[in-house]
C-alpha cells in the first residue's frame, strides 16, 4: 500500500533522481523541491525542471543564494576542486543539507506532507558530514520539535554504495533514464559527465562495478 505524499529534495543528479523513482513506487503524490544556492552550473536547476516536467510532477524552486554568499567552496566559487585524502573536500558546502532539509520541512508542512525524501548516503558520502545517518536522524527530531509536526525524513540510499544505487535504479526501471538524463558532474556535463571530477569518478566506478556484478549474475 502506498503512503499518501512525499516531498523530494531534488537536484536532478543520480541520487535524487533514483529517489524520485523510488518515491513514485511508494507514494500516491510526489512533489519536488530544488534549491538555487549559487551553484556553479545553473544547468543543474534546468535539468531538475526538465525531469520534473517529463514526470508530470509539481516542482518548487527556492532561492537560497544567500548560502553562496557566506560560504567559499568549489561548488559556488570559481576555484579548483580539491579532495585531499582524509579531509573534507572543498566541494562541501557548509550547512547545505541542514538548510535544504529545514526549508523543505517548512514547505512540506504548508503542503500537508509528512515524508521528506533525500538522497544522502553514508556509504559513499565523500567526506561530507551532513550526509551521515546520525545527522539526518538528529535533524529529524529537531524539525519535529521546532514545528510540532511529525516529519519523517526518508533516506532510501543511506546504506547503499554507488553500485547498489545503480542496481536500485535498474530495479525501478529507471537505469537508462538516470544514466542519460541526470547531472552529477561538477563541471556541468549531463549523463556520463566529464570523467575527471570526483563526482564523475564515484559515479563511473559504481556503474562499472554494478555492470560487472550484473554480468556475473
From Swiss-Prot:
UniProt cofactor(s) = Zn(2+)
Q: Which residues bind ATP?
A: 10-20
What Gene3D superfamilies does the database record attribute to this sequence? HUPs
Q: Which reaction does it catalyse?
A: 7-carboxy-7-deazaguanine + NH4(+) + ATP = 7-cyano-7-deazaguanine + ADP + phosphate + H2O + H(+)
Enzyme Commission numbers on file: 6.3.4.20
Q: Name one Pfam family in it.
A: QueC
Q: Which UniProt keywords apply?
A: ATP-binding, Ligase, Metal-binding, Nucleotide-binding, Queuosine biosynthesis, Zinc
Q: What is this protein called?
A: 7-cyano-7-deazaguanine synthase
Q: Give the note describing cofactor binding and stoichiometry.
A: Binds 1 zinc ion per subunit.
Its Gene Ontology molecular function terms?
ATP binding; ligase activity, forming carbon-nitrogen bonds; zinc ion binding
- Source domain of life is Bacteria
Sites where the protein binds Zn(2+): 185, 194, 197, 200
Q: What is the lineage of its organism?
A: Bacteria, Bacillati, Bacillota, Bacilli, Lactobacillales
- What family name appears in the similarity comment? Belongs to the QueC family.
Q: Which PANTHER family match?
A: 7-CYANO-7-DEAZAGUANINE SYNTHASE
InterPro entries tied to this protein: QueC, Rossmann-like_a/b/a_fold
